[in-house]
Amino acid sequence: MLPLYVVNNHGQFNHLILRTLRDMDIEATMISNETPPAEVARGCRGIVLGGGPTLERAGVASAYLDLGLPVLGICLGLHIMATARGGAIRRGASGGFGAVEVEIFEQNPLLRGYPDRMQVWASHADEVSVVPEGFVRLAGSSICGVEAMASPDEHLYGIQWHPEVSHTVNGRLLFENFDGICSE
């Protein structure tokens, strides 16, 4: 079985994403966000767009959305997804760093098994302000209106929080669910 690729967008938690997947016995490899899309398409069964400081340092990561593979965008990965598909981001009114209670508005395969409210760990200043056409807003919080979104037809999923850190309650479930999506 092909691995998942974790795209390094220069964020503080990208290596932790990789480590979490490997600790879960999910085969995963980290790649640069400058890896040619054709190479990515041949080498994996799903993509995790990790976090990072700015869209300007996202390399060619937005091109990976067009490969027909399932994609999970985390933090900056969500922003890459939103802007590449016609949405918008902005500086959040308060930003988020620390524990946040997220409310799930709509269940889907990525969020399967989670309760309607859950504690997550946030570490961001920007947020999605306009959800792209074809996407559904799945979750929000008091500090961020779009905590999760998805385009089910394209198998594109984005979350603002960090499931890879221990402060997110049951964060590994999200990776299990994404691995299942990539194995379908």
Swiss-Prot record:
> What does UniProt list as catalytic?
C75 (nucleophile), H162, E164
Q: What's the catalysed reaction?
A: XMP + L-glutamine + ATP + H2O = GMP + L-glutamate + AMP + diphosphate + 2 H(+)
What InterPro entries has UniProt attached to this entry?
Class_I_gatase-like, GATASE, GMP_synth_GATase, GMP_synthase_A
Coiled-coil region: none
Q: Which GO terms describe its cellular component?
A: cytosol
Q: In which pathway does it act?
A: Purine metabolism; GMP biosynthesis; GMP from XMP (L-Gln route): step 1/1
- Stored Gene3D superfamilies: 3.40.50.880
Keyword annotations for this protein, in alphabetical order, are: ATP-binding, Glutamine amidotransferase, GMP biosynthesis, Ligase, Nucleotide-binding, Purine biosynthesis
Keyword Ligase carried by entry: yes
Xref: Pfam families: GATase (PF00117)
Q: Where does the record place the Glutamine amidotransferase type-1 domain?
A: 3-184
Query: Which PROSITE patterns is this protein grouped with?
Result: GATASE_TYPE_1
Instruction: Tell me a Gene Ontology molecular-function term this record carries.
Output: GMP synthase activity
| Enzyme Commission code(s) on record | 6.3.5.2
Subunit (UniProt): Heterodimer composed of a glutamine amidotransferase subunit (A) and a GMP-binding subunit (B).
NCBIfam families noted in UniProt: guaA_Nterm, PRK00758.1
Cited function = Catalyzes the synthesis of GMP from XMP.
- Which HAMAP family would you find in this protein's record? GMP_synthase_A (MF_01510)
What is this protein called in UniProt? GMP synthase [glutamine-hydrolyzing] subunit A
